[in-house]
Amino acid sequence: MSAHDPARPRLLRPTVLFPLLLALLGALFVTQSGSSADAATGTLLRDGTGLYPRAVRLAHSGDANGRILASVVTFSGNDGLGAIHESTDGGASFREVGTVRDPDAAGGQGLCCSTLYELPQRIGDMPAGTLLWAASVGQDEPNRRMALRVFKSTDVGRSWSHLSTIATASNDKGLWEPEFSVDASGQLVAHYSDETDAAHSQKLVAARTADGVTWTGHHDTVASTLASDRPGMAVVRKMGDGTYFMSFEICAAAGQFQCVVHYRTSSDGWNWGVTTSLGIRPETADGKYFKHAPNLAWAPEAGNPKGRLFLVGQVLYNRDGSKAAGSGRTVWVNSAGGAGSWREIPAPVAVESTTVDYCPNYSSSLLPSADGNRLLEIATDWSGSVCKPYFATGSVPAA
């Protein structure tokens, strides 16, 4: 399952989500027998719905540096909310400290796929350490015109106010999965998935802002020559040598490599080369690959200017297309800027579910320690009919 299948149910309010899910399972998802109740290891981040987890370790927030903030999408009645959790003990425990309440996600209008970001430097009037939260809203409106809306917090996630809108759809198609980075020019960049172009089922787009308010330069970063291809779910990290690394999935016609994970690199975080280039498929030495909902992290590594990349995908496959034994229990590491083979390490949170949909191990959040030797993961899994987030931290084994 992909975040980019045109007919898939997005992260809707619970009153409509589960009936839709049940109706579409046969056509959209690959499901095998097996219990999914409380399948994930780790500790519950919250005892209730918590979708699309994201986590940041504060590094530009003065006395709050070292705290970990985590966000998930949740619901109260028909209102979509961003729940903000905080850890002051290195990820050993979390408590809820704030809520993002977007009126455009209230009353059943729809909320999906949020992100959380700490500004590493001043952007306009916003000092370094300002927190940003962004999400897709409006997918359930009768006259759908989705938007990517940004909120900010200047009090370590306790309160939030609307800042700007990255993009608003020109038609009833989708805008999904915003993620942030700061490019080499010092501007804030938003990366997102765009379904509004009639020439592409979906493509990846970037826009940027010098002040956090006015977004300009909207342009394609990955757009296949095949109209049916659906590149999406981009996440960008800047490596230690200044190179920018983008992970994403490409969903297309059914087959062994449907929704397989790819990557591209950029020298400045804004220009990504020929837009029709679909990038490189990362693999392990024995040919394993990830499919669906990738997520990415970077950390320094002693003696290595590039640092260390961490990559996770929803499902892990063997070279021959069979599901790998370590699927749902594996994270990858690479110390060569993505080049060459990737090394497998145990995932801190093990998700044993055999269901492939928008919950189990879907876009799991990875957060390395400051020295890169430990890794916090927040992953979701079904607990009965509720998609819940679980967290745990593990050591990163030496190569």
Question: Where do the language-model regions lie?
Answer:
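Hydrophobic core segments of beta-strands in well-ordered, beta-rich domains
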Residues: 55-76, 115-118, 125-144, 149, ...
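Secretory targeting and sorting signals
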Residues: 2-37
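Conserved blade-ending motifs and adjacent loop-strand segments that build the rim/top face
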Residues: 279-293, 341-369
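Blade-loop segments of beta-propeller domains
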Residues: 81-84, 90-138
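Structural motif
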Residues: 78-84, 142-149, 198-205, 254-263, ...
